């Protein structure tokens, strides 16, 4: 499942600038839910993709990273700045917990 998301994101990132239909089709296959009027500027990076739900009128500037190890829900009319990372998991930051 993880490799599938990465393969689809790679295909998305290789689409032409005018290939709106191809991009939409890849997002529909990659993501759990895709609203209307969603635009994501490549490159897009995902952990899975299949755990991300996007609402209507979502715009993501270049370099969106979705670490969707668990479900990610993005509502309607959301805009992401360049190089945003949405992460549902992480590593311990306290030194004692990292030992």
Question: PLM features: what roles do these ranges have?
Answer:
Residues 32-34, 38, 46, 72:
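Hydrophobic beta-strand core residues of beta-sandwich domains
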């Amino acid at each position: 499942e993880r490799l599938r998301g990465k393969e689809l994101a790679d295909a998305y990132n290789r689409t032409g600038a005018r290939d709106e239909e191809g991009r939409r089709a890849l997002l529909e296959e990659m993501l759990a839910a895709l609203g209307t009027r969603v635009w994501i500027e490549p490159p897009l990076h995902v952990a899975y993709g299949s755990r991300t739900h996007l609402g209507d009128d979502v715009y993501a500037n270049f370099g969106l990273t979705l670490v969707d190890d668990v479900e990610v829900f993005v509502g309607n009319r959301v805009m992401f700045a360049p190089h945003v990372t949405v992460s549902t998991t992480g590593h311990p930051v306290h030194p004692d917990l990292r030992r």
